[in-house]
Amino acid sequence: MSGDKPVEALSEAEAAAELERLARAIADADAAYYQNDAPELTDADYDALRQRNLAIEARFPALKREDSPTDRVGAEAGDGFAKARHSAPMLSLDNAFTDEDVADFAVRIRRFLGLAPEETLAFTAEPKIDGLSLSLTYENGKLMRAATRGDGQTGEDVTANARTLGDIPVKLKGKGWPERIEVRGEVYMAKSAFADLNAREAEAGRKVFANPRNAAAGSLRQLDVEITKSRPLRFFAYAWAAASEPFAQTQFEAVKAFADWGFVTNSRMIRIKTVEEVLSYYQEIEAERASLEYDIDGVVYKVDRLDWQQRLGFVSRAPRWAIAHKFPAEKAVTTLLGIDIQVGRTGSLTPVARLEPVTVGGVVVSNATLHNEDEIARLGVKPGDKVEIQRAGDVIPQVLRVVEPGQGAPWAMPDTCPVCGSAAVREIDDAGRADVRRRCTGGLICPAQAVERLKHFVSRKALDIDGLGEKQVLLFHEKGAVKAPQDIFRLKKNIEAAGLPPLEEWEGFGAQSARKLYSAIDARRKVPFARFLNGLGIRYVGQTTSAQFARSFLSWQSFWAAVKAAEEGGIESEAYNELIGIDGIGQAAARSLMAFEGEPHNREMLAALLEEVEVEDEIPAETGSPVTGKTVVFTGTLEKMTRDEAKARASALGAKVAGTVSAKTDIVIAGPGAGSKLVKAEQLGLAVMTEDEWLALIGET
C-alpha cells in the first residue's frame, strides 16, 4: 500500500491516491473530534497523518486536492453554576511531539508572515501547566467575573470561588492596566499540597483524588465556597483577551505587566530567538519535570511580537502563533480482558479494549481504543494478551503492542451491528478502496445511532438546549418520547400521547424543572444557521464546516436549495461546484450533504424539524468594509502578503473566500502568473483587480 511507502518513493499516481486516503482519514478524525467530542486518534497519530499529507503536497504541488486538509475545540458547562459566555473564545493549542514538528511550526510562521531568512523570529517559552483554565474579567481594575473554559465559548461562573485564591488579585495593583481586560491562566495544585489533601481525605474516610489536576478542578468547582477556600489552589497568569486598549508590544512584556498588576506568573518563562534555543529549553524543562512543584505535560511556545500574533490570527480551534510541545506519552502493561464495540453517531463501529485497571500517569485506565479492525490485525491482539498501553495528555488511551500473548481465541470484527443487527460494512470509495472503519447501515433505525445523534443535536456546539443533556436524552429515548430531533420540540405532546405521567411527576423532575426544560426547548425554536446545520450530525459537516457554509450562503433556504440541486445534478452540476468552491470545503463534505439529502428518511426528518424550528439567517459581521458579504477569489502570486494571510484578512473583514471562479464571484484578485481563473473571470465579466488595488479597497495601502 502507498500508505507504507516513504514520501520520496511515491510515484505520481501513488501520491494522488495517498492524498485522497489522507483527506478521508483526516476528515474522519476531524469529524470525531469536532462533532462527536470523542477523538479516535491520539494527537501523535493525527499529527502524523497531517505531516504526511503536507510532505506529499510539498513534493507534488500540482496534486494538491480541493479538499486538502487544513488546520482546524473541553467539556460543557455543568448545571451547578451559572453559565458565563466568553467575550473571545478560550481555544486550545495545536500540539508538537517531535523536534521536527517544532521546526515545521517555525517554518509555517515564517511562510505565513513572509519573513526573510535573516529576520529574527522570537518566541516565549514556558512550562505547560496541567491544570484548569480560568478567565478573569477586570473592569477598572476590579475583578468582576471568573469563568472556567467550558467548551471554549461558554464556561461556568465561579467568581465567588476564584476570589478565595490568594494568587488572584481582587483589585489590580500598579498602573497601566486597561479599563477592561480578561486575564487568563491556569488553576493548579502543587504536588506537595495535593499529597497533603489526599492524606486528609483518606483519614476522613472520603474518596481521594486521582491526580493534582482533578483535585484542582474539583476544588474550584465546589458549590460550597468554603470548601474551595480550604483547598490549596494556585494560579498562574499567562494570557489575556478583550483588552479595551493595548498595554504591551510583546508577549513577554504582557506577562511582565501581569506580575506588576499583582498576578503570579511563571518564573521559568523565557524569551528565545532560535529553534535551537527552543529545543534546548524543552530538554532542560523535561529534565527538571519531576523536581518542579507542579505537574506539567509539555512546553508552550508563542510568537513574541503581538503585531505578528494579530496577523497570524486563529484557526477554528487554536491560534496559529502558539504550539504545545508535549512530553512523550506515559505507558503501562496490563491484561486485555475483552474487546467491546461502540457504535457512533455516524454508524462507525469502534473496537474498545476492556482492560485490567492500571494506573498510567496518575490516572486509572480500564479502557483503551483499538481504532479499527485493521489496527487489531496489525497488532495481532486478542483477549487474554498482556498489552502495553499509553496515555498522552487527555487523549483516549491506546493499545501499542502485545507484550505477552495469552491463550484466548483470535478475535474477529462483527459484520453486523451489535445494537440493531443491521449489516456493518466497509464502504468502498470511487477508487475501489475500503474505508478503514466498518459502519452500521441501519441509520436512524439503529438505537445507538439515534441516541448519539440526539445527544449531538442538543449539545453545546449545536442547539445548546439548557437542561437537556445526555442523561435526559437517553431517558426520553428509552421512554419512547423522543426518537428524532423534531420530537424534542413535541416532548410534552409525545409524553401525553404515549400515556406517560406528566414530566413533573417523573423521578428527578419537579414542577419547576419541567417548566424550565420546556421553556429552554421553546427558546431554541429560533436557531442560528451554523448551529442548526452542525446539529444535524452529517458526516464531514462539523462546527467549522457549518460556519463556512453559513457565511457563504447566509440563508438556510439558499444553502439547502444548492444541496438539493447538487444531489439531483450530481458532481458535474453547477450547484456541486458552488459547494466545493467555498474556501476550505472539500468534496467529502459536499458528497456527504448530497447523500444525506438523497435518503428519504432524512428528508422526512428535516421537513418535520423545520415545522418546529426557524433557522435564522447568518448576519455578516459589520466591519464597515466595502468587501463585507462579497465573494472573493485570489489567483496568481501575491507580493505584499502570503496567500494564507490574504485569505485570513479577507475573512476577518466579512468577505467570503472561494477557491473557484463562478458567476457568483464578486471580485477576483489576480497577481503575476494568474491563469485559468483569471481567464474565466474575464469571460464572465467579473471585477478583476491587482493586489495593490485590493489593498487600497480594504484600506491597507
Curated annotation (Swiss-Prot):
Zn(2+) binds at C417, C420, C440, C446. It comes from the Bacteria. Its EC number is 6.5.1.2. It catalyses: NAD(+) + (deoxyribonucleotide)n-3'-hydroxyl + 5'-phospho-(deoxyribonucleotide)m = (deoxyribonucleotide)n+m + AMP + beta-nicotinamide D-nucleotide. GO terms for molecular function: DNA binding; DNA ligase (NAD+) activity; metal ion binding. It is an enzyme of class 6 (ligase). Belongs to the NAD-dependent DNA ligase family. LigA subfamily. This is DNA ligase. It comes from Hyphomonas neptunium (strain ATCC 15444).
